[in-house]
Amino acid sequence: MSSGALTKPQMRGLLAKRLRFHIVGAFAVSLGVAAFYKFAVAEPRKKAYADFYRNYDSMKDFEEMRKAGIFQSAK
């Protein structure tokens, strides 16, 4: 047993160090997911709604539904 003395492991601040690392990682992942959702889902949806309502004629749609007999009060 002539091996040198083993160095003691650091026991203080392990939780704080680990939490700091994981909080930074979680923040980066959440920003990435938010950016992905904005550009992959929200922007195309907003564009689709804008395209639809740009050419939408509510009176024409109302007249088609009235002729189909959907409304009871508008005959």
Curated annotation (Swiss-Prot):
Residues 55-75 are mitochondrial intermembrane. It is a single-pass membrane protein. Keywords: Membrane, Mitochondrion, Mitochondrion inner membrane, Transmembrane, Transmembrane helix. One of its GO terms (cellular component) is mitochondrial inner membrane. The gene is COX6C. It is found in: Mitochondrion inner membrane. GO terms for biological process: oxidative phosphorylation. SUPFAM superfamilies: Mitochondrial cytochrome c oxidase subunit VIc. Residues 1-13 are mitochondrial matrix. It holds the Pfam family COX6C. The keyword Transit peptide does not apply. Gene3D superfamilies: Mitochondrial cytochrome c oxidase subunit VIc/VIIs. CDD domains: CcO_VIc (cd22901). Disulfide bonds: none annotated. It comes from Carlito syrichta (Philippine tarsier). This is Cytochrome c oxidase subunit 6C. Pathway: Energy metabolism; oxidative phosphorylation. InterPro entries: Cytochrome_c_oxidase_VIc, Cytochrome_c_oxidase_VIc/VIIs, Cytochrome_c_oxidase_VIc_sf. Component of the cytochrome c oxidase (complex IV, CIV), a multisubunit enzyme composed of 14 subunits. The complex is composed of a catalytic core of 3 subunits MT-CO1, MT-CO2 and MT-CO3, encoded in the mitochondrial DNA, and 11 supernumerary subunits COX4I, COX5A, COX5B, COX6A, COX6B, COX6C, COX7A, COX7B, COX7C, COX8 and NDUFA4, which are encoded in the nuclear genome. Component of the cytochrome c oxidase, the last enzyme in the mitochondrial electron transport chain which drives oxidative phosphorylation. The respiratory chain contains 3 multisubunit complexes succinate dehydrogenase (complex II, CII), ubiquinol-cytochrome c oxidoreductase (cytochrome b-c1 complex, complex III, CIII) and cytochrome c oxidase (complex IV, CIV), that cooperate to transfer electrons derived from NADH and succinate to molecular oxygen, creating an electrochemical gradient over the inner membrane that drives transmembrane transport and the ATP synthase. Belongs to the cytochrome c oxidase subunit 6c family. The chain crosses the membrane at residues 14-54. The keyword Methyltransferase does not apply.
